[in-house]
Amino acid sequence: MASVKFQPRGRSKGRVPLSLFAPLRVTDEKPLYKVLPNNAVPQGMGGKDQQIGYWVEQQRWRMRRGDRVDLPSNWHFYFLGTGPHSDLPFRKRTDGVFWVAIDGAKTQPTGLGVRKSSEKPLVPKFKNKLPNNVEIVEPTTPNNSRANSRSRSRGGQSNSRGNSQNRGDKSRNQSRNRSQSNDRGSDSRDDLVAAVKKALEDLGVGAAKPKGKTQSGKNTPKNKSRSGSVQRAEAKDKPEWRRTPSGDESVEVCFGPRGGTRNFGSSEFVAKGVNAPGYAQAASLVPGAAALLFGGNVATKEMADGVEITYTYKMLVPKDDKNLEIFLAQVDAYKLGDPKPQRKVKRSRTPTPKPATEPVYDDVAADPTYANLEWDTTVEDGVEMINEVFDTQN
């Protein structure tokens, strides 16, 4: 069964405007924004300051035995201020949209319009050669398609007149074949209806049905998830100050091993990151961005490959703060190593309850060269903390 068209037929209110140019298609599985340059604007229309617009993705698929089989997407070009996203400003991050512009273009609506349904799309031409894995979809001529349909209609009528003489002898065979073809046709119509409904929902026409346990039938296309245009970057590809250790991306993967200026976190914290027990309590004593910027000192130093930014911040935490004990236990915790497992003591028949004792923490000598967290116990009302964040990223 053929794939669903991008442009729905008829004069419905939710119809998508037609592009002036034939679409592009990537032959491999890479998204368009990774293979097409950001100045790929089709030539031949508008002035120099109007060479700006966007490519929008049209998802394609086929229905095969009631299942949806994904096909390579088509990408249609629209000038800025036209098309299905005419209200978006230039470079507004949107799924399925790739913004392009040529130097000298103005970031304002071009007013170049869209194509009429009776017009043939233009073959896009570019200043530079397209990549090998990008092809132009051959445009179709609406008038020729209508002429072919009329010729097929006339041919069908003439054949029906010639076959009418033999209907008497073949009526019984036709009745049997008709019942079988109706069964097959009903399945094809169900597949087509389901595919059209899915296409209209993807284009924003009509309200999408809420997910539930009910199913329309065995031929209903399955909703297979598709990855968005913007893919999630791995932790190692992000700047260090944007990383969040979680799951397989441990503290060592994101920030390196403990030592030197990186002196916070026990072995459990390093292994589990933000999912470690007690992390939320310890993080509650970390100053926010506004506190670092407006309540501390900011120093910069120009390096060979970037600018080094150093934040210095002091804060006084009351000793009775419920999260302070957890926080202090993580400072220089890597120097203590993993605690040895304690042997289980067999309980006697008449165990004697032991008085509860408060945990005692060993004092760890601070290294004045690398230590970035210090506390002063001489303060009467609490603990004074000094936080210096070293950032050597670009």
Curated annotation (Swiss-Prot):
- Annotated region (Disordered), positions in chain: 109-190, 203-254, 339-361
Going by the entry's taxonomy, the superkingdom of the source organism is recorded as: Viruses
User: Low complexity bias located where?
Assistant: 143-166, 174-183
UniProt keyword annotations, A-Z? ADP-ribosylation, Host Golgi apparatus, Phosphoprotein, Ribonucleoprotein, RNA-binding, Transcription, Transcription regulation, Viral nucleoprotein, Virion
UniProt lists compositionally biased (Polar residues) regions at 213-230
Q: Which spans does this entry mark as compositional bias, Basic and acidic residues?
A: 233-246
Q: Which Pfam families match?
A: CoV_nucleocap
SUPFAM superfamilies, alphabetically?
A: Coronavirus RNA-binding domain (SSF110304), Nucleocapsid protein dimerization domain (SSF103068)
- Tell me where in this chain the PTM Phosphoserine is found: S145
**In the UniProt record, which is one GO cellular component term?**
viral nucleocapsid
The places in or outside the cell where this protein is found are: Virion; Host endoplasmic reticulum-Golgi intermediate compartment; Host Golgi apparatus
The known PTMs are summarized as:
ADP-ribosylated. The ADP-ribosylation is retained in the virion during infection. Phosphorylated on serine and threonine residues.
Looking at the record, the residues that make up the CoV N CTD domain are: 228-342
CDD domains assigned: CoV_N-CTD (cd21595), CoV_N-NTD (cd21554)
Q: Which InterPro entries match?
A: N_prot_C_CoV, N_prot_N_CoV, NCAP_aCoV, Nucleocap_CoV, Nucleocapsid_C, Nucleocapsid_N
Role: Packages the positive strand viral genome RNA into a helical ribonucleocapsid (RNP) and plays a fundamental role during virion assembly through its interactions with the viral genome and membrane protein M. Plays an important role in enhancing the efficiency of subgenomic viral RNA transcription as well as viral replication.
Subunit composition and interactions: Homooligomer. Both monomeric and oligomeric forms interact with RNA. Interacts with protein M. Interacts with NSP3; this interaction serves to tether the genome to the newly translated replicase-transcriptase complex at a very early stage of infection.
Q: What does the record's miscellaneous section state?
A: Bat coronavirus 512/2005 is highly similar to porcine epidemic diarrhea virus (PEDV).
> Which family is this sequence assigned to?
Belongs to the alphacoronavirus nucleocapsid protein family.
User: Which protein, by its recorded name, is this?
Assistant: Nucleoprotein
Q: Gene encoding it? A: N
